[in-house]
Amino acid sequence: MKNELKKINENFENQIESVTELIQFDKQIMDFCLHHLKSLNDKLKDGAPKINNPYYLADNAIMALEGIDKNKSFTKHYSIIYNQCLVLLVSHFTLTIEKIFSTVLKFQYSNDKLPKSAKNQIQLTLDEIDEVNQNPNLLKKLLVAKKKLTFQNIGNVIKSFENYLGIKIDKDQKLDDIKFAFECRHLIVHSVSKADEKFIKNCNSIKNRSIKKALYLDEEVRFTKSELEFVKFSMLLFMQELTEKLNG
């Protein structure tokens, strides 16, 4: 199981890194353009042409691009990209936590290590037990069907790990940051990022989050690079600590 969890974690880290590259994509483009414009400008000024007429040089273009970066002129446009990055982060987290749950559930069942409370809750028929004994991967699918198991919100994730694996998840700041990310993901996908009463009510109970502590009705929720860093760090730390606990 340790090797499987390690691979799942490594894959998650790679997915997070791919989102990081997307977050930084605008800076990479800007740096690329500035580098080549400045190089061209130096060649025009100091090379054989010895051009000094601003009309033929790239000084104004360089200043304009540097101004965009300095004044954050395109922040509103970038925020759409950053919000979609948040959606990606939550999607990667959801799929990863589901894979971890499935891996541990299969291991515990196959090695007769399921907690007593979990055995009482699962309640399989004789036919289902026979099917699962032949293919332990079916156990999670049966739970999804019979118990309406879902990993689309943190509350259900916590209950699933406690009820079926006997694993208690710490309720701390990083968990609140992840809870908030899940709420924002739902808002971005279903309400075009505009804060409604249900969203604000749900977020008011997430008191220990480290980002966007002030929310207002009908305000558009826009993520920044630094806020995405908080979410990324919380998710990575959560996965690391959970894996260590499972490997115990």
Where are these regions (language model features)?
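Amphipathic alpha-helices that form helix-helix packing interfaces
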Residues: 15, 22, 26, 40, ...
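Helix-loop junctions and short alpha-helical segments
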Residues: 55-184
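Generic structural signal of hydrophobic/aromatic residues within well-ordered alpha-helices
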Residues: 8, 12, 19, 26-29, ...
